């Protein structure tokens, strides 16, 4: 079953936290970013595939964009110009993020081991069902992103075929689009599909890993609510349960710290580029004459918003979860407990008050407010274009 990992929970086949990465890992495998051990048969084929992807995505596309600017810039129409300007911004941002993730990819395996450790504490059926639903949600997110991103590629390809121009104005030294239009369009679409898939992976992975973090925060909060509620248990058992909760929180914090450097670097690049991309997309709408061009631009705008808004929303929810966990811990039944329990509880409360936050480049917090501020830059781009009367000048030319 293709969509097995987005199904509702069924007893006997519940997902683990690690299963939230199934569809993401398949995409990573397609990009050649998970090299198999050399003990596996035909490992060298995958290494060749990885090399091909690196050459196409990280070498051919930047080269093609540079050569397009050098050779074809004087022949650009206004529509071609704004199509061309948007592609290098998004592509170069994706390449920089991809390089960062490739150098830090070992953090993924460490985080997945921590997922398994957190799952060990999920002994109740209710907890396992919640983990299953979180994993299914993460896989649904990957499917939705595929629909948005490759929907844009399909629309761009359709528009190119209707208009009679290659979709991304990418220079190809081997095939002349004027002589072999369909072949050039096919090559350009396949290579851009690689950068789009890379973009998808880089935009989705923070959402999935933080959603898993959130679900284990919620499960920890539920365990804290049950502390010292069973009158049949003795002080030693109550204390042991509290210690386990402290260990759970420590593991969750360590999980967040493992991912923070990678998320911080990639989101810094993304948040800086999203405002410029939205501004260029808004300006380009003024020059598109056909309905197809405007539809493609609209789908592209949705894809740009998908790069930052969902993760900023998840981080906003994570901040609320941290506050809720602090309140839950403070209002648990610890008053009247033995001294060692109260001492450990005070230590726990102090640590829990330090929220698990993600920042972009260690400069500004990743939240909805930051996303809105970066998106406002789009209005600045439009304002500059309008004040310079650039639209009318380009139309006259």
From Swiss-Prot:
Glycosylation sites: 75
Any one GO molecular function term: odorant binding
Localisation: Cell membrane
Topology in the lipid bilayer: Multi-pass membrane protein
Positions of transmembrane segments: 47-67, 84-104, 143-163, 193-213, 263-283, 295-315, 348-368
Positions in the Cytoplasmic compartment: 1-46, 105-142, 214-262, 316-347
InterPro entries registered for this protein in UniProt: 7tm6_olfct_rcpt
Tissues expressed in: Expressed in olfactory sensory neurons in the antenna.
Superkingdom, taxonomy of origin: Eukaryota
Claim: Membrane is one of the keywords in the record: yes
Function text: Odorant receptor which mediates acceptance or avoidance behavior, depending on its substrates. The odorant receptor repertoire encodes a large collection of odor stimuli that vary widely in identity, intensity, and duration. May form a complex with Orco to form odorant-sensing units, providing sensitive and prolonged odorant signaling and calcium permeability.
Family: Belongs to the insect chemoreceptor superfamily. Heteromeric odorant receptor channel (TC 1.A.69) family. Or2a subfamily.
Record text on subunit structure and interactions: Interacts with Orco. Complexes exist early in the endomembrane system in olfactory sensory neurons (OSNs), coupling these complexes to the conserved ciliary trafficking pathway.
Note: The atypical heteromeric and topological design of the odorant receptors appears to be an insect-specific solution for odor recognition, making the OR/Orco complex an attractive target for the development of highly selective insect repellents to disrupt olfactory-mediated host-seeking behaviors of insect disease vectors. Odor-evoked OR currents are independent of known G-protein-coupled second messenger pathways.
Entry protein name: Odorant receptor 85a
Record lineage: Eukaryota, Metazoa, Ecdysozoa, Arthropoda, Hexapoda
């Amino acid at each position: 079953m293709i969509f097995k990992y987005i199904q509702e929970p069924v007893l006997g086949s519940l997902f683990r936290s690690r299963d939230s990465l199934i569809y993401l890992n398949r995409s990573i495998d397609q990009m050649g970013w998970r090299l198999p051990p050399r003990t596996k048969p035909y490992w060298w084929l995958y290494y060749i595939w990885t090399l091909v992807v690196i050459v196409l995505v990280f070498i051919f596309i930047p080269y093609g964009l540079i050569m397009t600017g050098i050779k074809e810039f004087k022949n650009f129409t206004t529509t071609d110009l704004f199509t061309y300007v948007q592609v290098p911004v998004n592509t170069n941002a994706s390449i920089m993020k991809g390089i960062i993730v490739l150098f830090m990819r070992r953090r993924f395996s460490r985080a997945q081991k921590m997922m398994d450790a957190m799952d060990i504490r999920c002994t109740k059926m209710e907890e396992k069902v919640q983990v299953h639903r979180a994993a299914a949600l993460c896989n649904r997110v990957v499917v939705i992103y595929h629909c948005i991103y490759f929907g844009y590629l399909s629309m761009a390809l359709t528009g190119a075929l209707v208009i009679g121009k290659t979709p991304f104005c990418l220079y190809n030294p081997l095939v002349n689009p004027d002589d072999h239009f369909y072949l050039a369009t096919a090559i350009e679409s396949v290579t851009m599909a690689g950068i789009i898939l890379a973009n998808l992976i880089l935009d989705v992975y923070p959402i999935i890993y933080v959603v898993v973090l959130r679900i284990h925060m919620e499960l920890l909060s539920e365990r804290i609510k049950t502390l010292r509620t069973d009158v049949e248990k003795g002080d030693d058992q109550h204390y042991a349960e509290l210690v386990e909760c402290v260990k759970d929180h420590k593991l969750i914090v360590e999980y967040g710290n493992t991912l923070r450097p990678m998320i911080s670097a990639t989101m810094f690049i993304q948040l800086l580029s999203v405002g410029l991309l939205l501004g260029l997309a808004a300006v380009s709408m003024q020059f598109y004459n056909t309905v197809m061009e405007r539809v493609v631009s609209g789908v592209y705008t949705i894809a740009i918003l998908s790069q930052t808004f969902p993760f900023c929303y998840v981080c906003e929810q994570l901040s609320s979860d941290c506050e809720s966990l602090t309140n839950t811990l403070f209002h648990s039944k610890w008053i009247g407990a033995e001294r060692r329990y109260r001492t450990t509880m005070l230590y726990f409360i102090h640590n829990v008050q330090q929220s698990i936050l993600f920042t972009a480049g260690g400069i500004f917090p990743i939240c909805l407010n930051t996303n809105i501020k970066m998106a406002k830059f789009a209005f600045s781009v439009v304002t500059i274009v309008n004040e310079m009367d650039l639209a009318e000048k380009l139309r006259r030319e």
